[in-house]
Amino acid sequence: MGVRVGLLALSMLALGAASSMAQSADSRAAWSASANLITYVLPNEGNYAQPTVTLDRKWRHVEGRLNYEALNTASLWVGYNLAGGSAVAWELTPMVGGAFGDVGGVAPGYAGSIAWWKLDFYSEGEYLFDLTRSADSFLYNWSELALTPAAWLRVGLVTERTRVRASAREIQRGPFVGLTFRRLECAAYLLDSRHGAPTMALSVGWNFGSD
C-alpha cells in the first residue's frame, strides 16, 4: 500500500512539473524541474531502480524519491533554495521530508554544491528518524568531487552511505564519468571496484524549464 501511495505521489509531482512547464512563457521562466533515474546493478542481489523528481520555483523546492531510504519506500521533501558567489559559486537547499512504505520516518536533509574553475563538489544527505524503531535511524549521504574538462564531460570520485543494499564497507566509493547533451545528463558510477564485487550505478536525468 505504501509503495502504491509513493508511486502516486511521485507521479503527481511529475505531472505538476509538466503542468508548470506548460504555463505562459513569463511564468514558465520562473520554474525548473528534473527527473532522474539511477539503476543499481548489484553483484549478489537483485538490481533495482531509484527515481527522483524535483520541482523548483525561486526559493521553493519540492522533491519526491522512491527506493532511496529503503526498497519499497517513498519519501517527499520540501526545501528552501539558497545560492551565491561568482568566482566561487555555491548552492544550498536545506530540506525536511517524510518517508513511508517498508520504512517510515521523518528526516532533516540537504543538497548543496560549491564550484570553482573546473572543479566542483556536490553533496546530499539526510538523517532519517525511524518512527517504528529508533535504533534503526540512519544517516544517508551521496557526495561527488568532480572535474569538468569540457562542457559535456564530468569525471571524478563518488562516495555513498546507504542501507538499501548490503555492502562490505560502511561508505562505498569509486570513480564516475558523466556526459551532458543539452538537457540530458547521463553518468556511470563504479562503487567499491577494489573489493572484487563492485556495484555499478547507471544514472540518466532530464532537466525541464525554459532556456
Question: What is each residue range found by the language model?
Answer:
Residues 28-32, 46:
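Onset of an N-terminal alpha helix
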Residues 31-41, 53, 58-70, 76, ...:
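Transmembrane beta-strand segments that form the barrel wall of outer-membrane beta-barrel proteins
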Residues 40-44, 134-135, 165-168:
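Short, solvent-exposed secondary-structure boundary motifs
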Residues 102-104:
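N-terminal non-globular leader segments, chiefly Sec-dependent signal peptides
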Residues 133-146, 156-160, 164:
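A mid-sequence, solvent-exposed acidic-amphipathic segment
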